[in-house]
């Protein structure tokens, strides 16, 4: 008899509600703390409200990971629902303890096989893993095959972000060293990416136009190497800017399927408003 597999992820995937419902993806929220008040991302605070509150806040917002107890509660519930296995997919362990908390909680549940999976990224890059795992679980694919597919996606996947300034990342402790200093220089648009699970500075580019062009050049190489079949443009509270770039990319690279996503509160805390990102992988 096939094992019954559930898929769990966290709120930083920013998956559309209909996708979560259709694919039965369980979501554990991270929280954002604004002026001493904690909000569960996606439940107590929408993305639009977050950016509005940040503008009015006295202090710089921070984020916090879900406690192991939240995972224990969910895993127990899934076990009661008859699941044998849980694949718990989370944002990079290099920027958050969420993955570790899921893994620790999983070890405490008797009679349930919890496989914690480190996406090594975040946002819709992480969401791609959750969607693939959930589609395969619903098709009754075995655990080994699902993990093997996730590993293939990980091998092909990449993500680059352009931010307006690096101060948020520096204050949030998510950027190595004194790299934030470059952001204060006139017109510098830093391009960031994930390297060894951390957010690091990839390149310093003079203008937004040049930064986006540089990311497009990297995508072009990935397409030639057969590593980019589906991509997401990710925006920081500027859907128009995101959609404009998505349409441009769609016409430039018709062989790739492009969709629009966003940086929600937790990731927005670190990247700031106006950030733009692009992530891609195989389907």
Swiss-Prot record:
* A molecular function GO annotation: lipid binding
- Indicate whether Transport appears among the record's keywords: no
- Coiled coil region boundaries: none
Q: Which UniProt keywords apply?
A: Lipid-binding
What Gene3D superfamilies does its record include? 3.30.1180.10, 3.40.50.10170
Q: What is this protein called?
A: DegV domain-containing protein lin2658
Residues engaged in binding hexadecanoate: 63, 96
List the Pfam families hit by this protein, alphabetically.
Answer: DegV
In UniProt terms, what function does this protein have?
A: May bind long-chain fatty acids, such as palmitate, and may play a role in lipid transport or fatty acid metabolism.
**Organism of provenance:** Listeria innocua serovar 6a (strain ATCC BAA-680 / CLIP 11262)
The residue ranges of the DegV domain are 5-282
């Amino acid at each position: 008899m096939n094992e019954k597999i559930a898929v769990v992820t966290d709120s930083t995937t920013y998956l559309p509600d209909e996708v979560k419902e259709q694919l039965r993806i369980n979501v554990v929220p991270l929280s954002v703390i604004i002026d001493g008040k904690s909000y569960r991302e996606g439940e107590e605070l929408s993305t639009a409200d977050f950016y509005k509150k940040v503008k009015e806040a006295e202090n710089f917002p921070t984020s916090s990971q879900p406690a192991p107890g939240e995972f224990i509660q969910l895993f127990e519930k899934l076990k009661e629902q008859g699941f044998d296995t849980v694949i718990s997919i989370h944002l990079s362990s290099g920027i958050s303890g969420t993955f570790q908390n899921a893994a620790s909680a999983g070890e405490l549940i008797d009679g349930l096989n919890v496989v914690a999976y480190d996406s090594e990224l975040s946002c819709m890059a992480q969401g791609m893993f959750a969607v693939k795992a959930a589609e395969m679980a619903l098709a009754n694919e075995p655990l080994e095959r699902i993990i093997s597919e996730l590993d293939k996606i990980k091998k092909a996947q990449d993500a680059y972000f352009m931010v307006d300034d690096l101060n948020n990342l520096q204050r949030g402790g998510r950027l190595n060293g004194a790299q934030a200093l470059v952001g204060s220089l006139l017109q510098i648009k830093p391009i960031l990416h994930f390297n060894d699970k951390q957010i690091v500075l990839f390149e310093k580019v003079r203008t937004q136009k040049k930064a986006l062009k540089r990311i497009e050049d990297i995508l072009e190489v990935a397409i030639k190497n057969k590593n980019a079949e589906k991509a997401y443009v990710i925006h920081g509270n500027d859907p128009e800017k995101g959609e404009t770039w998505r349409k441009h990319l769609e016409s430039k690279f018709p062989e790739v399927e492009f969709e629009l996503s966003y940086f929600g509160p937790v990731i927005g805390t670190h990247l700031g408003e106006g950030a733009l990102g692009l992530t891609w992988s195989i389907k």
